Each structure stands twice: as C-alpha cells, then as structure tokens.
Amino acid sequence: MSAWAAASLSRAAARCLLARGPGVRAAPPRDPRPSHPEPRGCGAAPGRTLHFTAAVPAGHNKWSKVRHIKGPKDVERSRIFSKLCLNIRLAVKEGGPNPEHNSNLANILEVCRSKHMPKSTIETALKMEKSKDTYLLYEGRGPGGSSLLIEALSNSSHKCQADIRHILNKNGGVMAVGARHSFDKKGVIVVEVEDREKKAVNLERALEMAIEAGAEDVKETEDEEERNVFKFICDASSLHQVRKKLDSLGLCSVSCALEFIPNSKVQLAEPDLEQAAHLIQALSNHEDVIHVYDNIE
C-alpha cells in the first residue's frame, strides 16, 4: 500500500475509533492497485478524462467557511449549469456524443439530471462537438505560497492563458510551473449518506466499505446544495471498478470522476485566506474555467 493511501485510511480509521471509544480496532486496509502518474505542465492535455466535481469540501475550519460562500441561488444555479456544459463539451470532444459508448459523458449526464438541468441546455451542449475547444491545465501559486491548478476548456488558448495570468496577478497569485507536484490524480466517487434502503450510513461504516471496495480514503463532504455526501478516493485506474463495488454494497453513488487531490497542504493566515478565496472565486467566474483546485488547509 502506498504511503498516501495508508496515511489516509489511518486518519479515517482514527476518526472512527475516536467516535467509538477505546478498546476497538479497525480492520486493516487492503492494498490498492499501482498508481499511474499523470504528465505535468501547462497547456493542452490531449486524452484527458472528464472532470466534474459534484461535491465541495465541508468542515468547520476557516478555509471551508471562507472558500465556499455562495451568492444568490439563481446565480449559483446558473454557474453550476455553465460548468456542466463545459464538461459535456469536453466529454463529447474526447469520446463522442453517444453516452452508451462514452462512459465519461454518461457520468456527466447523470449529474446533469440530478441537478435538474434543462433538457434543452443539455442538447445544446451535446451539439457543440465540432467546436475547436482545447483542454487546458494551468499551474499557479496563490497567496501564502498555496498551489493552484486551473482546468479550462477554450477555443482560444492564448486569450484564455492571458486572462488567467491577469486574474492571478491582480489577486496575489502568479503563473508557476511546479504546482502540479502538490497534487495527485485520483478517482473520486461521490455517494449519498443514505443507502438504497434509505438507511443512514455513518463514517465508520463508510470506512469499512472503502476498504472492501479497494478505495484509499473516504471523507465526509457537502455538495453544492449543502447536502451531506461521502467522497470515496481511489487510484485513478480503479475508478469504475470501485464505484461498481460500492453500488453492489448498497450505496447510492451520485457521480464518479478524476480529480486532483492535494498531497500536501498549507495553512494560511487570515488575510491570505480571504485573498485566496477572492482569487479562486475570480478564476472560477471565468467562462472557460471548469474547476480550480487548491491545497489550502
């Protein structure tokens, strides 16, 4: 088992054991499959797998509170649909418009339906398969030495890069090669906190299922509608296999995708936290940006 996976499951097990009290031992985690590193660097990334984050970090630390302050519901809903459309276009570009032969597209359409996205909006995004969009991954440094990865889909890579650079420079950040080293590409399965029989699943049980399914970690999170969910993290090559196993255990998976998970985190002082939140919000508001990852604790 990799050090990352062992440490992650150990932390999750510790959380469960603290809740259960002394004298109780958790089952040992199972070895995950070997990792396959992703290429690093900025610019176009051909063959990239679809990404959509259906959940956002939850918790009671300052970053969780500052990072995810939302605007009016109608504005937030429009933003979510806009990012979903980008993901549809990317999935179609990479695997074609037929969800029966494109598992990434099938996954994102499943998320669209769960968010009650209008059918007409979905169909419009599906018809843009002939657009000259390019997937882009930019590396940056934010306030306090934080690392940022910015995913984008654009038909003008030069303009998009100039825009991203301007937003970073204006808000205490900078383009910086090397930020990718602070993240690992992992499979992420988002699961409801109730199983198919509508019975609540606690973190202890989720940890047991993570071990059984071959996941490396499980975290309690909230989705963008502030509903509690679990995030199961696994090796990228095992994503669909782990999801299938979790479903067979009676869980209700909401989505699965590849995400950049930080392998090291930084703590920021209050002024840097606020500036980082403003920077990430500004980046996220750009029409070409799919998602912004950070390693802030």
Swiss-Prot record:
Cellular localization per UniProt: Mitochondrion
Alphabetic keyword roster: Activator, Coiled coil, Leigh syndrome, Mitochondrion, Primary mitochondrial disease, Translation regulation
GO biological process, one term: mitochondrial cytochrome c oxidase assembly
Classification of source organism: Eukaryota, Metazoa, Chordata, Craniata, Vertebrata
Protein name per the record: Translational activator of cytochrome c oxidase 1
Coiled coil, from the record: 191-227
Function noted in UniProt: Acts as a translational activator of mitochondrially-encoded cytochrome c oxidase 1.
Biased composition (Basic and acidic residues): 28-39
GO terms for cellular component: mitochondrion
GO MF term (any one): mRNA binding
Natural source organism: Homo sapiens (Human)
